[in-house]
């Protein structure tokens, strides 16, 4: 079974080392390198082979660890818009590109230093000078790494933040549940999911999103509860929170807005309608279905008020599953089910994998 976390393009980036950690790692690997040489070989030739091999091993390990930072980091320009928007909010996409480019630009400098010092070792007939050349090369390469240390540190921090994002399959239709706290969103997600929903971090909220999967007919669907996101008036949000919310427009093929007409959730019916209007303004293109939950405990006069306000509303009892089948079927019908560009397997294959 696919773990949702795997669908986050940043979740499987290998461990990235700091500049000092790369230097230490490469040094330890190169000094442990064992050499085999003929006893009949002259000392100067044995030294030449040893120093060249140690330098090459040092450079090899440095490049491997640099590639973990650069080549294994997802291409920003190829990200799904949902992740692209969140990456911009959390770390800044231009800053990521700049830091990755700065680290990558170190590699030709390292190659140039390596070639020059290997050539010096090959031409030398003094075993002490060979050792000095190898140490000089390591010193210059270490200096290059230290000069780009801030870029490596930024990439490490970016990976830490972005790897926590929820795993969303961009090629599977997504239903996002909205509404005030305690209206029954998480109950709906848990009751319709075919497996235990996964819980994931979402930026600028103190609570976690709940992601479930289900099948409606022959269609696989993601359903997402958004506690702390679409559950309070927009006037209470700062600019960055609003930007994080608008990222959902790239995720939500359809929104189910749940209203508790019984007001047992702690919010009046009118307050819930006001929030609905705000969500409709923020997501003018996304289809929004309105569901009245807890109709079994709603006083008749309050239920009639809600019905009069929303003639085409869905009436459900999420805790019992009543009315959910029609709601979900119609939600999926609202989704544009054009052929997806890639299958889940293709998408997973495009993500970086830790080879360690």
Name the predicted role of every residue range.
Residues 285-289, 296-354:
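Canonical P-loop GTPase G-domain recognition
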Residues 167-170, 192-222, 226-246, 269, ...:
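Switch I (effector-binding) loop of TRAFAC-class P-loop GTPase G-domains
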Residues 157-168:
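Pre-Walker A adenine-sensing motif
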Residues 183-184, 323:
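Conserved glycine(s) of the Walker
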Residues 160, 240-315:
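Conserved C-terminal guanine-recognition region of P-loop GTPase G domains, centered on the G4
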Residues 100-156:
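Charged, amphipathic alpha-helical linker segments immediately N-terminal to NTP-binding catalytic cores
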Residues 40-54, 72-93, 227-251, 262-278:
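Switch II of P-loop NTPase G domains
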Residues 1-106:
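N-terminal accessory targeting/assembly segments
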């Amino acid at each position: 079974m696919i773990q949702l976390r795997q669908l986050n393009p940043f979740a499987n980036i290998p461990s990235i080392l700091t500049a000092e950690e790369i230097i230490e790692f490469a040094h330890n690997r190169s000094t442990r390198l064992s050499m085999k040489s003929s006893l009949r070989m002259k000392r100067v030739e044995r030294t030449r082979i040893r120093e060249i091999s140690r330098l090459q091993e040092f450079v090899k390990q440095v490049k491997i660890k640099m590639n973990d930072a650069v080549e294994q980091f997802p291409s920003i320009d190829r990200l799904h818009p949902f992740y692209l928007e969140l990456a911009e909010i959390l770390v800044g996409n231009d800053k990521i590109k700049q830091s990755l480019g700065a680290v990558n630009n170190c590699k030709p400098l390292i190659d140039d230093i390596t070639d020059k010092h290997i050539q010096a070792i090959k031409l030398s007939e003094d075993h002490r000078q060979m050792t000095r050349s190898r140490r000089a090369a390591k010193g210059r390469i270490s200096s290059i790494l230290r000069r780009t240390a801030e870029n490596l540190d930024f990439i490490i921090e970016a990976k830490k933040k972005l790897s926590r994002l929820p795993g969303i399959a961009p090629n599977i239709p997504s239903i996002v549940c909205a509404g005030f706290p305690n209206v029954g969103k998480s109950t709906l997600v848990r009751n319709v999911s075919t497996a235990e929903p996964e819980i994931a971090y979402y930026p600028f909220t103190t609570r976690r999103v709940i992601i479930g999967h289900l099948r409606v007919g022959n269609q696989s669907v993601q359903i997402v509860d958004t506690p702390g996101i679409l559950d309070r008036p927009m006037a209470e949000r700062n600019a960055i929170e609003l930007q994080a919310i608008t990222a959902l427009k790239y995720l939500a093929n359809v929104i189910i807005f749940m209203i508790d007409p019984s007001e047992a959730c702690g919010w009046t019916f009118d307050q819930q309608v006001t929030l609905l209007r705000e969500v409709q303004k923020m997501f003018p293109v996304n289809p929004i279905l309105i569901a009245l939950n807890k109709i079994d405990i709603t006083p008749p006069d309050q239920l009639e008020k809600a019905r009069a306000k929303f003639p085409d509303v869905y009436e459900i009892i999420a805790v019992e599953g009543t009315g959910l089948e029609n709601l979900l079927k119609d939600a999926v019908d609202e989704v544009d089910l054009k052929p997806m560009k890639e299958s889940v397997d293709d998408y997973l294959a495009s993500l970086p994998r830790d080879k360690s």
